[in-house]
Amino acid sequence: MSFDLVINGKTVKANYGETLVDAGLGGWVAIPHDCCSGQCETCRVTVLSGRVDDRGTAERNTVLACQAKVVANAEIAFDHVPEIAKRSGAVTGIATLAPDIIEVTVTLASPITMRPGQYLSVKFAGFPARDLSPTVRFDGTAGPGELVFHIRRYPGGLMSTQIGATIREGHRVQVRGPFGGAFLREGYGPLVLVGGGTGWAPIWAVAAAARREQRHRDLVVIAGAREAEGLYMRRSLDWLMDDGVREIITTAETGAHNPVLPGRPTHYLPSLGPEDTVYVAGPPPLVDAVKIKSRAAWARCYADPFLPNAQPLSLIDRVMAMLRRPAAAPAVTPASRPVPVAAGLPAARKRSEPAPGVARTATPARRSQARSRV
C-alpha cells in the first residue's frame, strides 16, 4: 500500500511502514539525517498535515524522520541546512583548557559552511572518525577556514589519548558534514542555553552567534561540570558578561564555591514557557532531563547528546600508536587568550540554499553509524 508524502512541497510515493527518511530517498528528496538511531536529532521534521506513526519521537508537531513511519498521506517540512561536504586540513593548534579537556584547532584548505551548533564527522589521519562540534575561540572569534574543537581526554580513548603525542600540529585531518539539528534559528523569544562538560562547545558557538546576529533576544546561560575545575569555559562566560548577558550560571557537582553553584544545571533552569527556546548539549542524562522539563512547559528544545565511545584502546592499538609516535613530541601548552582574527563563524545566511523540495545530492544514502565523541 502506498501513500502520498509531501516533503517541502514535493510529492513522493511512500510505502506503508517506511521511515520518512527512506521514503524521501526513494523519491530523491534527502531529508537531512546522520545517526539513523534517533539520537542526533538531525532529521527532526515538522508534520504540517496528515498522519505519521511518530514511534515515540513526537515533540509538539515534529517527529524524527529516521524513526517515524508512513501510515497515511501526510505533508512534512524541514529547515534548510547547508549541504553536506568534505574538506581536508591540518591541526594548527593544541592547548590545554582543563586537566582532561583539550582545545584542538584545525585549519581547512577551504572553509565549510555550517550553522552554529551543528557538528562534523572529523577524522584525524590514522584514527577512527569522531563527531565533534566546532566552536569559536573564547573571545568569540574564529579565523577563515578555522575549526576550534573542545575534546575530552578519556582514559583508553582511541583518539583523545593521542592528542599532543601522535596527533600534533601538522597532523592531517578530514571533515564531513555538517550534521545536527541543534543549530541557532531566527526567532524573537528568550534563549536558554545549557551546556554540560564539552557540550559547552556547541552552546558557546550558539551563544556567540546569538550575540552577533540576534541581540534583541534575552539570554540565559547555564554551564555545568562534575568538578569545579572542569569549568574550563570561564573566559567565554566573562566575554558574555562583558557583552551584556546578565543571567549566567555555573554549576559543579563537587568542589563548588561562590560564584559556582552546587548541583547540576537542571537545578537552576528558569521557569520555562512556550515563548522560550532551549538549546542543550552534553551528557545524555543532562540532555534528557532538560528535554523533559522543556516539553512539560511547551518550550522548544534543540538537543545534542554527547555519547562517549565504548571501544577502549586495545594492546595492538597501543603498540601501533607507539610506533607512529615521533621521537620528541612538543608539550601541550596552556591556552592563551587569542588575538581576534575574524569576526566569528561564517554567517549562516551566506550560503546557497536549494529550493524547497529539491533533492540534496550530497546525501545519496542513509548514513547509519554510532556517534562517538572520543
Regions found by a protein language model. Name each.
Residues 48, 79-81, 125, 178:
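Short, surface-exposed secondary-structure boundary micro-motifs
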Residues 13, 34-36, 69, 113, ...:
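Residue-level "contact hotspot" at macromolecular interaction interfaces
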Residues 29-51, 59-72, 285:
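Local cysteine-cluster metal-coordination motifs and their immediate loop/turn environment
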Residues 62-83, 169-175:
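Short, structured interface segments
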Residues 144, 152-367, 373-374:
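FNR/FR-type flavoprotein reductase catalytic core
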Residues 86-172, 225-227, 252-254:
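Ferredoxin-reductase
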Residues 1-32:
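N-terminal pre-ligand scaffold of iron-sulfur
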